[in-house]
Amino acid sequence: MSRLSIHPEGSTNATSPAEPLLESDDPAVIKVELAKRGIAFQRWPAKVKLDQNSSESDILAAYAVEIARVQADGRYPTVDAIRITPDHPDREALRQKFLDEHTHAEDEVRFFVEGCGLFCLHIGAEVLQVLCEQNDCINVPAGTRHWFDMGSKPQFCAVRFFDNPEGWIANFTGDAIAERFAKLP
């Protein structure tokens, strides 16, 4: 189930965050709270059951209608699919790469068609932890400080939309704030 926790960024303890200001697993509450902070959150039906051996092109073909809908306005000409499983040979390196706080020059749009991942958004004096699961689509605007955790045994597949042909390019902030917040097991 999708979940939102909102924490103040500060804490009297250097190794853990302050108690959450809000916690909810209600998609309507999640959508409203994120929208107040400029983050789009929608629930889309992940209608297609993918085979574990589905290729990237199979995944993109299965969600061609949804992809076309997002790409219709021309903002996101580049799309790919990422699938990380517990036996993925690069899972640890990929997890580490996403765990440090960073920004992007473009929006980060993800539609989860399987599994889950934890987006942590550092907005103003708050950190919003958004557990995205199957059927969730999140749009993190360009310049938003954030990090992403897929867990030590990741299991997710997401369609990713980009407004540049290079795809995922991070600008790391150097802030160690992510170390104070819970990660997925």
Swiss-Prot record:
Site (May play a role in metal incorporation in vivo): E101
Annotated metabolic or biological route of this protein: Amino-acid biosynthesis; L-methionine biosynthesis via salvage pathway; L-methionine from S-methyl-5-thio-alpha-D-ribose 1-phosphate: step 5/6
Swiss-Prot/TrEMBL keywords: Amino-acid biosynthesis, Dioxygenase, Iron, Metal-binding, Methionine biosynthesis, Nickel, Oxidoreductase
Segments for region (Disordered): 1-22
SUPFAM superfamilies associated with the record: RmlC-like cupins
Reaction catalysed by this enzyme: 1,2-dihydroxy-5-(methylsulfanyl)pent-1-en-3-one + O2 = 3-(methylsulfanyl)propanoate + CO + formate + 2 H(+); 1,2-dihydroxy-5-(methylsulfanyl)pent-1-en-3-one + O2 = 4-methylsulfanyl-2-oxobutanoate + formate + 2 H(+)
Pfam family, one: ARD
EC number: 1.13.11.54, 1.13.11.53
Annotated site location: Important to generate the dianion: R110
Site (May play a role in transmitting local conformational changes): residue numbering on this chain: D107
Cofactor: Fe(2+); Ni(2+)
Top enzyme category: oxidoreductase
MF terms (GO), sorted A to Z: acireductone dioxygenase (Ni2+-requiring) activity; acireductone dioxygenase [iron(II)-requiring] activity; iron ion binding; nickel cation binding
Family per record: Belongs to the acireductone dioxygenase (ARD) family.
SUBUNIT field: Monomer.
PANTHER family linked to this entry: ACIREDUCTONE DIOXYGENASE (PTHR23418:SF0)
Protein name per Swiss-Prot or TrEMBL: Acireductone dioxygenase
